[in-house]
Amino acid sequence: MNIENLKTKAEADISEYITKKIIELKKKTGKEVTSIQFTAREKMTGLESYDVKINLI
């Protein structure tokens, strides 16, 4: 696979995972997800990961 294909696959996988978690939260809490905020956690060598904040109503 080339880099573009790998990137596209990773984006689709992440999107699918987030969708599953939104559905799971709605079922367990009965509330809607209003927003998801991603804050990058970086090191001197680049992006390490993200902190995630989910808001429900």
From Swiss-Prot:
One Gene Ontology CC term in the entry: cytosol
Record's signal peptide: none
Any GO BP: unsaturated fatty acid biosynthetic process
Membrane-crossing residue ranges in chain numbering: none
InterPro entries to which the protein is assigned, alphabetical: Gns
Entry similarity comment: Belongs to the gns family.
Function: Overexpression increases levels of unsaturated fatty acids and suppresses both the temperature-sensitive fabA6 mutation and cold-sensitive secG null mutation.
The protein's name: Protein GnsB
Species for this entry: Escherichia coli (strain K12)
Lineage start: Bacteria, Pseudomonadati, Pseudomonadota, Gammaproteobacteria, Enterobacterales
Gene encoding the protein: gnsB
